[in-house]
Each structure stands twice: as C-alpha cells, then as structure tokens.
C-alpha cells in the first residue's frame, strides 16, 4: 500500500489472476477495460472511496455482480473476496475528509478516480467511469457511462470494492468515535447521526464543508460542499 501525503490518497496494489466481463459496450481494439466507481460522496463523515477493477476476458466470470447498493452487506463481502482474488488488476483510493473540505467533494471524487485508474494503468488500455463526467489527466482513454454500475460488470465490481473498503474503514472509525455509531450509518445523514452531531459536535472525521456539520459547529451560514471556495485539486478539472 502506498500513500501520497499531498492528496491523502491510498492506493491498494493490484491482485493477480482474473475474471470475465461481458460488457455490452466494446472498446477500441479490444483493450482491457478498467471499470471505475466511487462510494461515499454523500456522507457527512469519512472519506470518499474510488475503485478501479480490470477484468480479463480469458478467465471465468464472477456470477452475481450488481450495483453495490442493490446487494446486502454480506453479499458484498463475498463478492469483494472473489473480485480481489481473481482480478487482473484492482486499486482503491481514499480521499479523506480534510482533503474533501479543502478541494470540495466533487474535485475529491475526480482526484480519486484519476488515482484509481493510475493504479491499474499498467494493464488497462481504457477506463469506463460510472456517471457523466471524465476526470482530466487520466493515463488512458476513458468514457463516462450514466448508470454504469447497473450496466457494466467492471463498474459493478468497482462499486463493490469501493463500498466494502469504505464500510470497513467506517467500522474502524466507530471504534475511535463510538458516540456517532459510524458502524451503523457509515457517516450518512441519518436522524441518529444528526442527533449525535448536535450532542457531541463533530469529530476530525466529519466534513466541515457539509451543511449539517457546519450547523453543528454553530456557524451562521450553512453551506454545502459545493458552495465552499476551494483550491484546485492537482489541476483536476473535467476532460474536454
């Protein structure tokens, strides 16, 4: 595992072996595809996680892949183990709450996507990203696919890897800050989480650019992360 102090990104190295993708969206020259997806854009606490997964068409498929949001936590864990064991390459990037507050959640997600693709660029010739935006500066050609986590198997796998990685971390953070019950809501804005914020105030894992956290801090103006002035994220903007 490598860490970059400049962007607080954690990249998990690739596993070996492979699985199969039958994506209906072909890429030029049959290049290996990196599916890319994120988990944790909306929560009030914790990092945003971005994963990239590369499939090998010569290997058997993993059955049961789906958008991580459609799977139970137990099923996600089962599929995660299969993905990381048999993937040709995979990577996970975590951008923490401090960096999210510095550059905003959108730019943090774009940064995570770029770092995740860089983590599999030694095998991937093309990246397919869930959503409608492609970050600038990717190491290979890419396209955005709206609803890709329900359409493309590589993106489904990435969504599972990102979600499981982040959920595991939030359970670890619960041990450090049990008063917020991060193990239950994973940092999302549930009534119990909002009540804990009002009672205890925010901890270092909370995103201070998000309106409910700002209100808990007693700030008069509650701004969302998108309203907060931000520094450029390593030159990251949208690809033209």
Curated annotation (Swiss-Prot):
SUPFAM superfamilies the UniProt entry points to: Ribonuclease H-like (SSF53098)
Gene Ontology biological-process entries: DNA replication, removal of RNA primer; mismatch repair
Record: residues binding a divalent metal cation: 37-38, 130
Catalytic activity: Endonucleolytic cleavage to 5'-phosphomonoester
CC annotations in GO: cytoplasm; ribonuclease H2 complex
Residues covered by the RNase H type-2 domain: 31-222
Cofactor info, note text: Manganese or magnesium. Binds 1 divalent metal ion per monomer in the absence of substrate. May bind a second metal ion after substrate binding.
Enzyme type, top EC level: hydrolase
Source domain of life: Bacteria
Keyword Repeat among UniProt keywords: no
Subcellular location: Cytoplasm
Cofactors demanded by this protein: Mn(2+); Mg(2+)
An example molecular function term from Gene Ontology annotations: manganese ion binding
EC number: 3.1.26.4
Short name of one Pfam family: RNase_HII
Keyword Nuclease recorded: yes
Keywords recorded for this protein, A-Z: Cytoplasm, Endonuclease, Hydrolase, Manganese, Metal-binding, Nuclease
Entry's family note: Belongs to the RNase HII family.
Functional description taken from the UniProt entry: Endonuclease that specifically degrades the RNA of RNA-DNA hybrids.
Protein name: Ribonuclease HII
Gene name in the database record: rnhB
